[in-house]
Swiss-Prot record:
It holds the Pfam family AIRS_C. Belongs to the FGAMS family. Substrate binds at residues 99-102, 121, 245, 317-319, 540. It is found in: Cytoplasm. It comes from the Bacteria. It comes from Geobacillus sp. (strain WCH70). ATP binds at residues 57, 96, 500, 537. Keywords: ATP-binding, Cytoplasm, Ligase, Magnesium, Metal-binding, Nucleotide-binding, Purine biosynthesis. Monomer. Part of the FGAM synthase complex composed of 1 PurL, 1 PurQ and 2 PurS subunits. This is Phosphoribosylformylglycinamidine synthase subunit PurL. Mg(2+) 1 binds at residues 98, 538.
């Protein structure tokens, strides 16, 4: 659309064209008041993306304020590209998780690939070198042809981008549930390492300093991507395919290396990724944070398509682009630095003192907006909240008691459930060993990477059981953070902090907003108890298809520090003769469990309870024992209960088995999903030391016969399965479903 054909300010108002951009009547009236006039088409577009939920968090900000965001090791909390935590030796870890759900529903390969690209840029824009990627994925049931297509292409997109850019994808989770049929979730997390003195922030300051554009040229891809991410998916969404960006990982690799060199230069004032809302958000946010203004000449913006209008250039979400502020008079050295990597850096504007975003095009001012109105002073809404009827119904139900007659068959059926089954089909497509720092590869409780030049390592995981959160958002929110911490502790690391991706439905529905509020309440409480502040994150709302919301899914990304690489622990049993202990008692808790879904085809009732004092005590005891060198293996008991966790401990070995004794209600002992529990193996010579440190129950020992044997105290056999048989079911489930014709 040329400038001549753009609607006039009067047309925009009278024909309510702003509504098509996602602005409400009230918001348009606010814009008129801020500007003291009607906005033109470019200005309306700029306000619409900056005031979208995706950029402004206007519906979620009041809720996000509940999170604890500070701690003695936190160097950077929410509000920048990524959060940063001190890990000693002058080093820090930077990490963040983000969603790319809507684009992945429409164009799964590019949607997932550019999600990975964007999160990498967030981390290196802080000056950190990305060392690892993780992801958290949700799809509908794997029996549907459409879900198979989305699953295969999302995984290929993540692999294609991460492998080319040379950053290992080391962990994550994949779950399947009908609630995600039309709206998959693709959350990508990146972890980086940085020296304290190299930390950069996205700030524009210093009147007269140069605003510089670096990276790929601007095209028409991704226009209104931020607005697209702030509305529900409908039958019409397919037509929005042009709103999905296209990624170039080789350009990203060059940009990464060049930016990591430029952050060491004192010529750099600030740097930010052009992410959601592209040039608009990066310029407005940097100016607002610095307390300055920015003016740019859009004729100077590198373009790869002819005849682009200011509206298109400002709203494009073309990938692999960064905005820099450089000291006046030092531009040449920055040009030369980027040229060394075959990249063009281009001066497109300067920092001003009037706190305005002023855009020129063909000699005329085409937009003039106060930067604070776009960034920190964007409107904030306190949405009404209402407890859903389904929640009251579930709370009133009698506890669900499953009827299980054949324990062996039930265990094999659970191992074949796609959510529990081996994800090897996924991670074998990822290069998880590139850069050779990966110590614990995908498949254990958490991934572990050593930190070169030190004796330390980092453990990292993504976790969230969305079924529990659907049944009871507050309890489920607590469990999500606690489970992430369990996975970190089982790896021999102390949990440091979290990043979160809050994936929910439409916040304008009071029942959905209630889910968001309650989940955040639960998460916040556990973060305080465990001392893991929230240092970064992302909100993805409007995850609905034709009015049906996904399960509320606040994904937790957590990083922990292994003080000494000798403490690194995995879930795999180590040698025959080691003693097997269980930490924690099983109760009859099956609401939202894998067993309930397997037997009933749906979930209902109450989520498992969690006692935070018990949780913290058990985690601390286990970590102390691991650090004392008396634990051979550790695994948390999660989806599928004790039997599934025990099977995973033996399936991770070469030829080992286990013989354990259980008593009481066998179904609960084997399959209940009671929280705060672990399976631990200990060498016989460490038995006394271990039992002094940890309150645990001795239940059996590791064998060398390749069999999982579960007996009652009377000697009656409950389960006797060869590890090979279990492994073939567990490993074959996902490939088998993908091959089958629905």
């Amino acid at each position: 659309m040329s400038l001549l054909l753009e609607p006039t300010p009067t047309m925009i108002k009278e024909e309510k064209l702003y509504r098509e951009m996602g602005l409400t009547d009230e918001e348009f009236a606010m814009i008129e008041k801020i500007l003291g006039r009607l906005p033109n088409y470019t200005e309306t577009g700029i306000f619409s993306v900056m005031w979208s939920e995706h950029c402004s968090y206007k519906n979620s900000k009041p809720v996000l304020k509940k999170f604890p965001t500070e701690g003695k090791h936190v160097l950077q909390g929410p509000g920048e590209g990524a959060g940063i935590v001190d890990i000693g030796d002058g080093l820090a870890v930077a990490f963040k998780i983000e969603s790319h759900n809507h684009p992945s529903a429409i164009e799964p390969y590019q949607g997932a690939a550019t999600g990975v690209g964007g999160i990498i840029r967030d981390v290196f824009s802080m000056g950190a070198r990305p060392i690892a990627l993780l992801n958290s994925l949700r799809f509908g049931e794997l029996t549907s042809p459409r879900v198979k297509y989305l699953f295969e292409h999302v995984v290929a997109g993540i692999a294609g981008y991460g492998n080319c850019v040379g950053i290992p994808t080391v962990g994550g989770e994949v779950q399947f549930d009908a609630a995600y049929e039309g709206n998959p979730l693709v959350n990508a997390m990146c972890v980086g390492i940085i020296r304290h003195e190299d930390i950069q922030r996205g700030i524009a300051s210093g009147v007269g300093n140069t605003v510089m554009y670096v990276g790929a040229k601007t095209g028409r891809d991704g226009i209104h991507g931020a607005t697209f991410a702030s509305e529900e998916l409908t039958e019409q969404s397919e037509a929005k395919r042009p709103a999905v960006q296209v990624g170039d990982p080789f350009m990203e690799k060059l940009l990464l290396e060049a930016c990591l060199e430029v952050v060491k230069s004192d010529a750099l004032v600030g740097i930010q990724d052009m992410g959601a809302a592209g040039l608009t958000s990066s310029s407005a946010e940097m100016a607002s944070k610095g307390g300055f203004g920015i003016e740019m000449n859009l004729d100077l913006v590198p373009q790869r398509e002819a005849g682009m209008t200011p509206y298109e250039m400002m709203l494009s979400e073309s990938q692999e682009r960064m905005l820099l502020v450089v000291k006046q008079g030092r531009e040449q050295e920055i040009y030369e630095l980027f040229a060394k990597y075959g990249l063009e850096a281009k001066a497109i504007g300067k920092v001003t003192d009037d706190k305005m975003l002023r855009l020129y095009f063909r000699g005329e001012v085409v937009a003039e907006i106060p930067v604070d109105a776009l960034a920190k002073d964007a409107p904030v809404y306190h949405k009404p909240s209402k407890e859903p009827a389904y929640y009251r119904e579930f709370q009133a139900m009698e506890p669900y008691v499953p009827a299980v007659s054949n324990y062996e068959e039930t265990l094999l059926s659970l191992l074949a459930q796609p959510t529990i089954a081996s994800k090897e089909w996924v991670y074998q497509q990822y290069d998880y060993m590139v850069r050779t720092n990966t110590v614990v590869a995908p498949g254990s409780d958490a991934a572990v990477l050593r930190i070169r030049g030190t004796n330390k390592a980092l453990a990292m995981t993504t976790d969230c059981n969305s079924r529990y959160i659907y049944l009871d958002p507050e309890t489920g929110g607590k469990i999500a953070v606690a489970e992430a911490a369990r996975n970190i502790v089982c790896s021999g690391a102390k949990p440091l902090a979290i990043t979160d991706c809050l994936n929910f439905g439409n916040p304008e529905k009071p029942e959905i907003f209630w889910q968001l509020e309650k989940a955040v309440d639960g998460m916040s409480e556990v973060c305080r108890v465990l001392g893991t502040p929230v240092i970064s994150g992302n909100v993805s709302l409007y995850n609905e298809t034709n009015g049906e919301a996904i399960y509320p899914t606040p994904v937790i990304g957590m990083v922990g520090l292994v003080e000494d690489i000798r403490h690194i622990t995995t879930q795999a049993f180590q040698q025959a003769g080691d003693l097997i202990y269980v930490i924690g008692e099983a109760k009859q808790e099956f609401g939202g469990s894998e067993l309930q879904k397997l037997l009933e085809g749906r979930i209902f009732g109450k989520a498992p309870e969690i006692d935070l004092a018990t949780e913290a005590k058990r985690q601390q005891e286990l970590l102390t024992a691991i650090q004392a060198g008396v634990v051979a293996s550790a695994h948390d008991i999660a989806e599928g209960g004790f039997a599934v966790a025990l099977a995973e401990c033996v399936m991770s070995t070469n030829g080992l088995g286990a013989k354990v004794t259980v008593d009481g209600d066998i179904t609960s002992q084997l399959f209940s999903e009671t929280q705060s529990r672990f399976i631990v193996s200990v060498k016989k010579e460490n038995q006394e030391k271990f039992e002094k440190l940890v309150e645990a129950k001795l239940i059996g020992e590791v064998t060398n016969d390749g069999t999982l044997l579960v007996e009652r105290a009377s000697g009656e056999v409950v389960i006797q399965l060869s590890v090979e048989q279990m492994r073939s079911v567990w490993k074959g489930a996902i490939p088998c479903l993908l091959k089958s014709k629905a």
